[in-house]
A protein has these predicted regions:
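Surface-exposed loop/interface segments of Gram-negative outer-membrane beta-barrel transport/assembly proteins
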Residues: 264-343, 384-391, 395-481, 497-499, ...
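Short, small/polar-rich motifs associated with maturation and membrane association
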Residues: 1-397, 402, 409-411, 481-482
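A short, polar/charged loop-to-alpha-helix boundary motif
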Residues: 489
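Active-site and adjacent substrate-binding regions of carbohydrate-active enzymes
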Residues: 493
Length: 568
């Protein structure tokens, strides 16, 4: 049985196109460690060969997973390495999965060591899991507190800083791709800085938003493009009802908790990181190009003539019968000229390019037993898949924690983000798909032709916006996300915490469309100009009381949480 398998590590659709090739060029750390990471193995295609696919043989494998005592394990994750294809074991510890013959199975379960097993020629597997005490003692963020993995009963997946830094992306969410079972991540478009569509629990609603709730250091954040991936310590993904219930209806689609890096007592550490990545458009929609379009015109004329006299299959039109019959509208060339020269125009290819992303980060952290700090700065420049589309993002972060005494602890975080986006109109790519390829975008002197279609005078040249002064859309955004907290521990096991957050956003958008831009020429209007400014400010005040106590010889524990949250 053959099956078409496509592995895409970066989903980025540029108005119908997707970017699927991403690789690191170089990396630099404070220790002057330089590494070159090989290009990810992915399915891609060039502009002329849209249909390239990777075809591989698949087979069905079965297995039984047991623990160290020989008992079957329920709910063990079985994932095909590098993909989101996977399953979990049933009540008898068994699983069945369709996999490529050369696949590697990743077997994982909380509290046990992860195993990588090559499938090879085997069809049945007997797997014994080993407990991992170090993992069991790790803590994960759940709701308004933390819990050891050995005590965790809900469905929680963790992505650590090391996994995030391996992902060459301006958006940290893409580090979770293929690492969290059941998580689907797609980039909304190929524009620079485009958002990420995250689907954690499937499509629960046709009309409503299915995105999970995203929290940064316990506060609702929203856009993940504002966060520098290098500032993130860990991401916890809460999926089941027991883990997300505390967030009410906002957690109905799952919750992603992002914890940023904080200072640690000890020597001051300086880290410098840099990388360059490239996104390439692929899966470009097919259009009738060149002689295929001519063939379509011939077939259409033959069909029309057959209908006219009722004699089917007797008409055989010539190229001269279908080309040169259009109105032409005074164009400096004829369709026959294009046909004879073979100088057809691939409009989508003229609009697209490879997107280059550069990222640079510098962080300084350290402190004493009482006071710790973390300071970081980042700069990212991302090029979109359309020409003249570019986003520049600059981040600054400061976090300070101070232990006043054994009872009182205070701290603060400040995250500042500045974005400058020279944005392209998404409509031009769609317009390029219905342009006739039997046409030229420029005349013999290199001047752009406003309306190059020999059939429809209203069809504007989709390259018009590339001309200097024809189109300009600049969006400047500033965001300050500041949090302060006070924490009291009057007795052992009892923690009272109050947290206050201010989220201030300012956006300025300027838009100019010349009368000879694509949209204005298409609609026969004059030039258009707009200047918009928006300000947003949100306040969040959380108060929580946590009490944890052990009893019964430390075999049992009781956790009590009381709290209130106010948002304005």
């Amino acid at each position: 049985m053959e099956n078409v398998q496509k592995t895409r590590r970066l989903f980025a659709s540029a108005y119908g196109c997707k970017a699927s090739r991403s690789f690191l060029i170089w990396g630099l750390s404070a220790a002057m460690f330089i590494s070159v990471i090989p290009m990810m193995a992915e399915v891609s295609s060039d502009v002329r060969n849209f249909g390239t696919q990777l075809v591989t043989q698949v087979k069905s494998v079965t297995g039984t997973i047991i623990d160290e005592t020989g008992e079957p394990m329920i709910g063990v994750s079985v994932l095909v390495q590098g993909t989101t294809t996977g399953t979990v074991t049933d009540l008898d510890g068994k699983f069945v999965l369709e996999v490529p013959a050369n696949a590697t199975l990743v077997i994982s379960y909380i509290g046990y060591k992860t195993q990588n097993i090559k499938v090879g020629s085997q069809h049945a597997f007997a797997i014994k899991m080993e407990s991992d005490n170090e993992v069991l003692d790790e803590v994960v963020v759940v709701g308004y507190g933390v819990v050891k993995k050995r005590d965790l009963t809900g469905s929680v997946s963790s992505v650590k800083a090391g996994d995030i830094q391996k992902t060459a992306s301006s958006n940290a969410m893409q580090a979770m791709q293929a690492k969290v079972p059941g998580l689907d991540i797609q980039q909304s478009s190929g524009q620079a800085g485009s958002g990420i569509n995250i689907n954690l629990r499937g499509n629960r609603s046709i009309n409503a938003d299915n995105s999970p709730l995203i929290l940064v250091d316990g506060v609702e954040y929203g856009s993940t493009i504002d966060i520098n991936p290098s500032d993130i310590e860990s991401m916890e993904v809460l999926k089941d009802a027991s883990s997300t219930a505390i967030y009410g209806t906002k957690g109905a689609n799952g919750v992603i908790i992002i914890s940023t890096k904080r200072g640690k007592a000890g020597k001051t550490k300086v880290n410098l990181n840099a990388y360059v990545s490239v996104n390439e458009p692929t899966n470009i929609p097919k259009v009738m190009y060149g002689e295929r379009e001519v063939r379509r015109l011939l077939d259409a004329k033959n069909y029309k003539d057959d209908i006219a006299d009722g004699s089917w299959g007797t008409h055989h039109a010539k190229v001269e019968d279908v080309l040169g019959t259009a109105p032409n509208f005074g164009l400096p060339y004829s369709e026959m000229d294009v046909y004879n020269e073979g100088s057809y125009t691939d409009w989508p290819n003229l609009l697209l390019k490879n997107g280059l992303t550069q990222n640079y980060d510098l962080s300084i952290s350290g402190g004493s037993e009482k006071t710790t700090f973390n300071i970081s700065m980042g700069a990212m420049v991302e090029g979109g898949l359309l020409k003249n589309d570019k986003l520049a993002r600059y981040n600054g972060k400061l976090s300070v924690d101070h232990k006043v005494n054994d009872i009182l602890k205070v701290g603060m975080d400040m995250l500042y983000t500045h974005k400058n986006h020279d944005k392209r109109s998404g409509n031009v790519f769609g317009r390029s798909l219905y342009m006739s390829t039997i046409a030229h975008p420029y005349d013999a002197d290199g001047n752009i032709i406003l309306r190059p279609s020999p059939y429809y005078e209203a069809h504007a040249n989709p390259l018009l916006d590339d001309q200097e002064g024809a189109y300009d859309n600049n969006i400047v955004t500033n965001r300050l996300f500041a949090t302060s907290y006070l924490q009291l521990t009057p007795i052992k096991g009892l923690t009272l915490k109050t947290l206050f957050n201010v989220d201030y956003q300012q956006q300025h958008e300027g838009l100019y469309r010349d009368y000879q831009s694509v949209s204005e020429l298409q609609s026969a209007k004059g030039s258009y100009i707009s200047n918009d400014q928006n300000h947003y400010i949100n306040y969040t005040w959380d108060n929580t009381l946590n009490y944890i106590t052990d009893f019964g010889g430390s075999d049992h524990s009781l956790t009590l949480l009381l709290g209130s949250s106010t948002k304005r």
